[in-house]
Design a protein with these regions (language model features):
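Glycine-rich hexapeptide-repeat left-handed beta-helix
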Residues: 3-45, 79, 83-87, 93-100, ...
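N-terminal segments that cap or nucleate solenoid repeat domains
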Residues: 26-70
Length: 205
């Protein structure tokens, strides 16, 4: 994993998504002008029970809660606004997280972000799933349990439990409770898989 940091490690946060809004004012916050020099960036806060692949890139004000995972070649770049990844959420291979001034990235609990997806200045609520190659743009909130289909471009808020697809994404139908539970189970599977990778890393040095 590549980390670009310049300051001493700050105190570890509580790692609970419900408490994160209170942490934002204590961080660098969201910039209103140009990106400062790296010396101004806080160091990432990665819970000991989170897993970050060696080839993932974590820069600046990024916080991963327990059980969160960042997979190979994923990028979390917190040089403009904070990036918060909640407990048990996974950011899969090649996905990109980044914010804009006053538009941080906030990811809830048991969220799945598929391969090569982009989440830019958006909020993903608990249990939602962002499909492979989908793009979620600034200011959007994807509601709890929602599903963004692969390749979609999301430009407006997604209701909780909705399936959206297309470019721009449109609501197609409401997901069943079983389908929403399945998405959270998928995230839990990735949490277990991340633990296996972490164990293999420890065993192999």
């Amino acid at each position: 994993m590549e980390r670009i940091t310049q300051r001493p490690h700050p105190p570890r946060g509580p790692g609970q998504p419900g408490e994160w809004p209170n942490l934002v004012p204590q961080s660098m916050g969201c910039l209103t002008g140009s990106t400062p020099w790296p010396e101004a960036w806080p160091e990432p806060r990665i819970d000991p029970l989170a897993w970050v692949a060696d080839s993932a890139v974590v820069i600046g004000d990024v916080r991963l809660a327990a059980g969160a995972s960042l997979w190979p070649t994923a990028v979390a770049r917190g040089d403009v606004c904070p990036i918060l990844v909640g407990e048990g959420s996974n950011v899969q291979d090649g996905a990109v997280l980044h914010g804009d001034p006053d538009q941080p990235v906030t990811i809830g609990v048991d969220v799945t972000i598929g391969h090569r997806a982009v989440v830019h200045g958006a909020t993903l609520e608990d249990g939602c799933l962002i499909g492979i190659g989908a793009i979620v743009l600034n200011g959007v909130t994807v509601g709890a349990g929602a599903l963004v289909a692969a390749g979609s471009v999301v430009t407006r808020n997604v209701p909780a439990g909705a399936l959206v697809m297309g470019a721009p994404a449109q609501v197609k139908r409401q997901l069943s409770a079983e389908a929403q539970a399945g998405q959270r189970q998928h995230a839990r599977h990735y949490r277990q898989l991340a633990m296996a990778h972490a164990q293999a890393r420890r065993e192999n040095g």
